[in-house]
Every structure is written in C-alpha cells, then in structure tokens.
C-alpha cells in the first residue's frame, strides 16, 4: 500500500477533535453556497446534486458517534474519502466547469488551506490532492459535454503551488513542535516510571523485612512484645535506608522536572554562591549505589570562586554528570572534580577514567533526546546541563579519549564580570521593593533608582504598614526604617509579627547616631543597613540584599540599642496573681527591679515609701481600679505625680481607650500581650 492504514488512523486521530465543527460547516455550507452562487452572484455553472452529496458526506462526520460500533471502525477511511471528495475534487471540478473563473480559483485556494489543516500528513495530503485533481479532470472531460477553453490556467499554478508548499512547511514546523512536546511528555512519564521502580522495590523489600520481625495478628496471643538490641538496630537501619530511598526518589523526580521544564532554568532565584560549598554538598548528597562509588569521587580545590546562579540547578547539573560517569565506569574507576580559575573564567572540571566517548559523537551529546548505548536513558541530562550553564552566562564543553577518559569543563563568568552584571540588571527588572518609613530622602533615592532600573517600588509609613495583612508583603526586598517604626512603641512588634511570614529579604534601616529602645525579634532574619549607606550607594545596597544574602553577616548587634537600666524599679499592679507573677518574672529577667501590688489602693503606699520609675497597672480591679488610681496620682502634690503609667486592659474599644487617655495614663497594652510587645513598651518609657 502507498499509504498504510496506521498512517490513515493517525491522520484521523489528529483531525478528530475538530471534525464536529468541520462537519457542521460542510453539511450546512455546501447547500447554502449553492444559493449564493446561483442567485446572489450567479456563476456559469452550479451543481446542486454534487453539493448535496458533499453535505451528506459531512453529515456522516457530524453524527459519527451515533453510528453503530461496527461502522465506526471504518471512520478513518470514510474521513479520508470525504475530505478528498469535498475539498480537492469538488473545488477542482467546479473550477474547471466554470472555466477557471477568478471566484472559483480563489475558492480552490481556500480549500487548499482547509485541506492542509485537516490532513496533517504531508505525503497523504499531496497524494490525495494529486489524485482528486486528476479525477476532476477525468470527470470534466470524460463525463460532461462541457470542455473548458483552457486546459490549465498557468498563471494560477504558481499561486497554488506556493500555497501547498509553504502551507505545508509552516504546518510541518508546528507539527514538529507538537510532536516534540508529546515526546517530552512521554519521556517524562517513562522517566518517572523508570526512576521510581527501584526506590519502590527497595521500600517493598524493607517492608517485607519489617513484617518478618513482628508477629502476625492471627497468631498474636500477647498484648506486649519485646525486641532485642539486634532487632532494634535492624529496624533503625531499615528505617534509615527507607529514608535514603525516599530521598533518592525525590531527587530523581526533581531532576526529571528540571530537565524538561524550560521555566525551571530561570534566573529568578539566582544569587551569589560559593562553588566549593555547592559542590561539596552535591558530592555528599548524590545517591550513590554503594560505598565504593562514593569513595571513587575526589574533589580538588585549587582556586575557589563565587558564581552567580542557582545552587540547586548546579547541583542537578553535577548529578547528571556523575550519573553518566558511573554508568560508563570500568575497573579501577575514579572521578576527579577540580575547581580552578583562569584569567577570564572560573572552571569546574569533571574528569573520569571511564570508557570515553567516540569523536564523532561529541557534537551530538548535548542535543535533546540524544542517547547512545544507555538503557533507560532519555537524552535529557546533558542538554539540561547546557541550558543551566547558558543561564549562568557560561558554557559546558566535553573532551574525551575513547577507552581512556572523559572530561566535562563547566566555564563560569567571573562574579564581577560584565556578563554577570548584565544578568543582574535584567533580573533586577523583575524584582519588587517596599520601603516602610517616612524619610523622604530615602524615598526619593529609591524612587529614582526604581525608575532607572525598572523594578517595582512602594513606599508606605509604619502606621500604614501595620494595617496591612501578611499577604500584602509579597516583595523581594522589604526595608523597614527603625526611626519610623519606633516612633510609637507598639508598632515594631506588630510589624515584626506580620513580616515573620514574608519570604523576601528584610532590611532594618537605622541611624548610627541614635539609640533604639526596642527588642528586635530574635527569630526574624534581618540585615542591618545604616541610613548613610543607603543614601550614598542605594544600588549597591539593594543588589547585595537581593543577590548576596548568604554572604552577608546579618550582625544585628550593629544596631545601637538603648541599654537596659538595671536600677529601674517597676510597680506591677494587677488583681490576677498569675498575670502579676508572670509579668514580674519577665521583667526581672531583663534586669528590672519589680514591686507588686494587687489593688489600686496600694499604689500610693508603695510610691510614698520607695522610688518607682514606671507603673504597669491593670485598669479593672475590684476595689480601686487603674483609672481611679491614676487620677489620684496625677492629682497629688508629690514628685511622683508625673511618673509614666501604662494601662493594662483586655478591652480595646474606643470608649475604653478614651478613658485611658483622659485618666492621665501615658500608654496602654491590650491583653493578652506577648513578650516582645510588653518589653518594647516598658523599654520605651523607662
């Protein structure tokens, strides 16, 4: 057969999703155009019978799913006949019968486009078109009395040929892209199945071993069972091996995902990394098959360097190279990974003494899906390595002596090179920055830089920031001005609670000439930035915060904090003994001296008998409440009448807060307050 049935079935399967639409268009369009060409724009020849036959054929495509099952198996052949009859044959026949009129020449060209779209196989389409046009000629000259004045209108032929040839070329390009995607999907599925079979088999074996160590439920006669030391060690060994198997399986999946996903080779997560740290971790975590393989890998560090890129991508690239090396190993096998520098580039050399690669294959090994002599391989590893190195601004090349050695050289641009700076500049355009503060000089500098470098910039005050939800801080860089955040004692703890959910880098802008009466959240990763540095070199500071986080010291101790004054005495007044005791312990741990009272009536007695620097008082107490006690203090004629008083209340309604202000209290804390809120509030007033 010129065209096999398998090819016809593939053509039908490709067109099947669009057949209902095409069928309805043909079933309705063929009769409708009879009236157009017969009455609206009359042509010299029309054939209603031929149009009805075409409409009936297209109707079969519309109702194909309603046909008996035994008929549906013939649908591929029926489809091919219908397309051949209704497109190239019908339009060629009508063009000849209308003596090559312009309207029918244009109609024939339109049918060519539809023919190319519906029959994706170029050979089938070309044979069908040629055969149908020949049959049309035979029908015109052999079955009708009409004979066209011109056998072939040669001026139309170049246009028809151009449409067929270039239409097929464009369609062929799209088809190749489609088949590549399908191939990638199949490869990915096959890779997952292959890579997971061994880990699952290992887990199954581990489960079987554990099952032999425990009694079966049917034979269990006791409620308690004991394990000896050997059995316990074996169980732990099995569990550890199971963890290793799961880790290896996850690595395999991640490697496959990054190998086939173009988006994963993206500079979005690029940062400054130490190549030695990355390679040491990769060599340590690579899923070796046995201890001998692990001992065969040697790392030589001649000149360490930093690179701009992704540590994860470089790790997976190295995994690919090691995986290939171990697959083609031979006796006395070894791998040497060396790190060195030249005058222009930084290099990683991965050299093994395996079987080597033939010279004629060296040019093909970086092509997608190319593989040779390797069962279970899908030709994704080395192309992935090339994509990674290209994204880093570098290259990868291979040299080999067949039967002796293979060496891959990964070349990186220097960290301070123009290549890396260009990558940073483009990457900076995708970043977003928010400044939380009221320093207009900083706002102007950052806004100007944002315009020049085209990154997103937002500026808000600390008061505005505390009203935002945590999801509204999805920025790559967050700069918090301590001058604004500490203007009121309670803002910083609230902001730190919200920022603890942020994934971006957080910088605290401080003035070295000031001291801050705050306790910075020890669990929050922050980078201190002096106000002078960000005003002098804003671009350098931002690039360091975005791209060099791991190499920054993050020494929060450079922020000048107000030293605790251990001689300060605080009076804690609360009728709840638990709260009073807890608060006293917390303050004493910070070096304060604490005096306790359980009612407002005792406040004046303590203040008359000793020096008190701050009163922390509950508002609602049974005998004399905090508001009344505050009024008594403010209305007295003693020196302590101006002592700072912080109210402690569980009611934060506007009415209660208004009473707090009118009573003479300096500040308030809403119950329940966490440790940082309490300490920051106290530090702000003593």
From Swiss-Prot:
<keyword id="KW-0418">Kinase</keyword>
<dbReference type="InterPro" id="IPR001789">
    <property type="entry name" value="Sig_transdc_resp-reg_receiver"/>
</dbReference>
<keyword id="KW-0904">Protein phosphatase</keyword>
<keyword id="KW-1003">Cell membrane</keyword>
<protein>
    <recommendedName>
        <fullName>CAI-1 autoinducer sensor kinase/phosphatase CqsS</fullName>
        <ecNumber>2.7.13.3</ecNumber>
        <ecNumber>3.1.3.-</ecNumber>
    </recommendedName>
</protein>
<feature type="transmembrane region" description="Helical">
    <location>
        <begin position="21"/>
        <end position="41"/>
    </location>
</feature>
<feature type="domain" description="Histidine kinase">
    <location>
        <begin position="191"/>
        <end position="416"/>
    </location>
</feature>
<keyword id="KW-0378">Hydrolase</keyword>
<dbReference type="InterPro" id="IPR036097">
    <property type="entry name" value="HisK_dim/P_sf"/>
</dbReference>
<feature type="domain" description="Response regulatory">
    <location>
        <begin position="569"/>
        <end position="686"/>
    </location>
</feature>
<dbReference type="GO" id="GO:0005886">
    <property type="term" value="C:plasma membrane"/>
</dbReference>
<feature type="modified residue" description="Phosphohistidine; by autocatalysis">
    <location>
        <position position="194"/>
    </location>
</feature>
<keyword id="KW-0812">Transmembrane</keyword>
<keyword id="KW-0808">Transferase</keyword>
<dbReference type="InterPro" id="IPR005467">
    <property type="entry name" value="His_kinase_dom"/>
</dbReference>
<comment type="function">
    <text>Senses the quorum-sensing autoinducer CAI-1 ((S)-3-hydroxytridecan-4-one) which probably functions as an intragenus signal. The sensory signal is then relayed to LuxU and LuxO.</text>
</comment>
<feature type="modified residue" description="4-aspartylphosphate">
    <location>
        <position position="618"/>
    </location>
</feature>
<dbReference type="Pfam" id="PF00072">
    <property type="entry name" value="Response_reg"/>
</dbReference>
<keyword id="KW-0597">Phosphoprotein</keyword>
<dbReference type="GO" id="GO:0005524">
    <property type="term" value="F:ATP binding"/>
</dbReference>
<feature type="transmembrane region" description="Helical">
    <location>
        <begin position="124"/>
        <end position="144"/>
    </location>
</feature>
<keyword id="KW-0547">Nucleotide-binding</keyword>
<dbReference type="InterPro" id="IPR036890">
    <property type="entry name" value="HATPase_C_sf"/>
</dbReference>
<dbReference type="InterPro" id="IPR011006">
    <property type="entry name" value="CheY-like_superfamily"/>
</dbReference>
<dbReference type="GO" id="GO:0004721">
    <property type="term" value="F:phosphoprotein phosphatase activity"/>
</dbReference>
<keyword id="KW-1133">Transmembrane helix</keyword>
<dbReference type="GO" id="GO:0000155">
    <property type="term" value="F:phosphorelay sensor kinase activity"/>
</dbReference>
<dbReference type="InterPro" id="IPR003661">
    <property type="entry name" value="HisK_dim/P_dom"/>
</dbReference>
<dbReference type="InterPro" id="IPR004358">
    <property type="entry name" value="Sig_transdc_His_kin-like_C"/>
</dbReference>
<dbReference type="Pfam" id="PF02518">
    <property type="entry name" value="HATPase_c"/>
</dbReference>
<feature type="transmembrane region" description="Helical">
    <location>
        <begin position="152"/>
        <end position="172"/>
    </location>
</feature>
<feature type="transmembrane region" description="Helical">
    <location>
        <begin position="77"/>
        <end position="97"/>
    </location>
</feature>
<keyword id="KW-0472">Membrane</keyword>
<feature type="transmembrane region" description="Helical">
    <location>
        <begin position="47"/>
        <end position="64"/>
    </location>
</feature>
<feature type="transmembrane region" description="Helical">
    <location>
        <begin position="100"/>
        <end position="120"/>
    </location>
</feature>
<keyword id="KW-0067">ATP-binding</keyword>
């Amino acid at each position: 057969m010129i065209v096999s049935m398998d090819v016809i079935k593939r053509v039908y399967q490709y067109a099947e999703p669009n057949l209902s639409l095409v069928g309805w268009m043909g079933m309705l369009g063929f009769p409708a155009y009879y009236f157009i060409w017969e009455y609206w724009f009359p042509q010299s020849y029309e054939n209603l019978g031929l149009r009805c036959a075409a409409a009936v054929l297209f109707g079969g495509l519309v109702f194909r799913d309603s046909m008996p099952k035994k008929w549906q198996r013939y649908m591929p052949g029926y489809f091919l006949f219908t397309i051949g009859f209704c497109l190239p044959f019908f339009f060629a026949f009508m063009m000849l019968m209308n003596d090559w009129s312009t309207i029918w020449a244009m109609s024939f060209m339109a049918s060519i486009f539809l023919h190319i779209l519906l029959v994706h196989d170029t050979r089938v389409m070309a044979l069908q078109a040629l055969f149908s046009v020949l049959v049309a000629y035979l029908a015109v000259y052999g079955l009708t009395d009409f004979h066209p004045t011109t056998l072939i209108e040669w001026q139309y032929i170049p246009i028809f040929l151009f449409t067929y040839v270039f239409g097929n070329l464009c369609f062929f390009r799209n088809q190749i892209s489609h088949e590549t995607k399908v191939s990638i999907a199949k490869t990915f599925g096959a890779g997952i199945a292959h890579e997971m079979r061994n880990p699952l088999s290992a887990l199954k074996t581990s489960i079987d071993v554990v099952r032999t160590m425990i009694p079966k439920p049917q034979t269990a006669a006791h409620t308690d069972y004991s394990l000896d030391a050997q059995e316990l060690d074996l169980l732990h060994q099995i569990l550890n091996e199971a963890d290793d198997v799961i880790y290896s399986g996850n690595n395999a999946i991640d490697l496959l995902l990054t190998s086939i996903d173009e988006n994963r080779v993206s500079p979005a997560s690029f940062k400054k990394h130490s190549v030695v740290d990355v390679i040491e971790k990769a060599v340590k975590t690579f899923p070796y098959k046995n201890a001998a393989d692990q001992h065969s890998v040697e790392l030589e560090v001649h000149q360490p360097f930093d690179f701009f890129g992704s540590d994860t991508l470089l790790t997976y690239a190295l995994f690919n190279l090691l995986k290939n090396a171990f697959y083609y190993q031979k006796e006395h096998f070894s791998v040497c990974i060396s790190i060195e520098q030249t005058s222009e580039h930084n290099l990683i050399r991965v050299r093994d003494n395996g079987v080597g690669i033939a010279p004629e294959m060296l040019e093909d090994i970086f092509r997608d899906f190319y593989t040779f002599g390797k069962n279970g391989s899908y030709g994704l590893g080395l192309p992935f390595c090339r994509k990674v190195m290209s994204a880093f601004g570098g290259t990868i090349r291979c040299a080999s002596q067949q039967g002796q050695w293979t060496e891959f050289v990964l070349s990186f641009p220097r960290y301070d090179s123009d290549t890396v700076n260009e990558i940073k500049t483009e990457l900076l355009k995708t970043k977003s920055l928010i400044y939380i503060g009221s320093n207009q000089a900083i706002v102007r500098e950052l806004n100007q830089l944002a315009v020049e470098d085209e990154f997103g910039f937002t500026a808000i005050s600390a008061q505005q920031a505390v009203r935002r939800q945590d999801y509204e801080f999805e920025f790559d860089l967050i700069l918090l001005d301590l001058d604004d955040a500490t203007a009121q004692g309670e803002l910083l703890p609230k902001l730190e609670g919200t920022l603890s959910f942020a994934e971006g880098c957080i910088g605290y802008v401080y003035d070295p000439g000031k001291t801050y009466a705050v306790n910075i959240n020890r669990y929050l990763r922050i980078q201190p930035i002096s106000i002078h540095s960000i005003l002098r070199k804003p671009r350098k500071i931002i690039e360091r915060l975005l791209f060099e986080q791991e190499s920054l010291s993050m020494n929060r101790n450079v922020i000048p904090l107000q030293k605790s004054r251990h001689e300060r005495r605080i009076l804690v007044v609360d009728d709840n003994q638990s709260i009073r005791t807890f608060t006293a312990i917390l303050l004493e741990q910070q070096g304060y001296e604490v005096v306790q009272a359980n009612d407002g009536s005792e406040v004046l007695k303590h203040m008359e008998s000793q020096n008190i620097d701050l009163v922390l008082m509950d508002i609602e107490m049974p005998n004399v409440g905090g508001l009344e006690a505050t009024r008594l203090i403010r209305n007295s004629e003693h020196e302590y009448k101006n002592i700072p008083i912080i109210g402690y209340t569980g009611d934060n309604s506007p009415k209660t807060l208004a009473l707090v202000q009118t009573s003479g209290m300096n500040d308030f804390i809403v119950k329940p307050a966490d440790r940082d809120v309490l300490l920051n509030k106290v530090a702000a007033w003593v």
